[in-house]
């Protein structure tokens, strides 16, 4: 349904399809990985599961910059975020767990919170109600990273551990960002309908 809202404009449709694909890719890789038992196939899926996080990070910002920004502010951030994603996936493939324990986590956070500048621009152009799902979705992802990094808390031993809480945080963050994107999937929001916005242009 998200992609369908972009019909009639090929640029919007492609950018929305990128986000939809990255979301489905992450959820699919994670599901298959957790269903497999120990072995080579599970090891391969673990690599794909972690690579999918980079793809989702870049895929999430793609429609926001493709639809809401123009010129330099559209293409440069997209080029940067996809370059970081490609770098992260490549390093993950080469160095495996030796890299991802700390450096990879840092890359995830940099990719996510690197979009804070864009969030502020959109906040000023429209208002807080427009960007709140983007902002709190980022908070949810960050909380998940902190939980999995600290390996704490364990709510119910063997049932609800930091790993399960990480997955909950990802679902919450993804849902918020999906709903945020749905706001403008059909085109640019009407600035005039948001009288408290300062109407700062990002062009």
Language model: regions and residue ranges:
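Multi-pass alpha-helical transmembrane bundles in non-GPCR membrane proteins
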Residues: 1-203
């Amino acid at each position: 349904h998200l992609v369908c809202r972009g019909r009639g404009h090929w640029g919007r449709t492609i950018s929305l399809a990128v986000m939809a694909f990255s979301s489905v890719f992450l959820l699919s890789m994670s599901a298959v990985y957790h269903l497999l038992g120990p072995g080579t196939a599970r090891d391969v899926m673990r690599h794909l599961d972690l690579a999918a996080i980079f793809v989702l990070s870049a895929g999430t910002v793609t429609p926001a910059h493709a639809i809401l920004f123009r010129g330099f502010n559209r293409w440069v951030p997209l080029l940067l975020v996809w370059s970081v994603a490609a770098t992260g996936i490549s390093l993950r493939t080469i160095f495996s767990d030796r890299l991802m324990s700390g450096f990879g986590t840092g890359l995830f956070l940099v990719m996510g919170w690197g979009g804070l500048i864009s969030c502020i621009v959109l906040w000023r152009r429209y208002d807080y109600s427009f960007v709140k799902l983007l902002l709190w979705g980022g908070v949810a992802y960050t909380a998940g990273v902190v939980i999995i990094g600290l390996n704490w808390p364990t709510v119910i031993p063997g049932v609800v551990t930091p790993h399960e809480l990480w997955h909950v945080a990802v679902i919450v963050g993804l849902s918020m960002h999906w709903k945020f994107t749905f706001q403008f999937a059909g085109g640019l929001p009407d600035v005039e309908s948001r009288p408290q916005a300062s109407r700062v242009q990002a062009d």
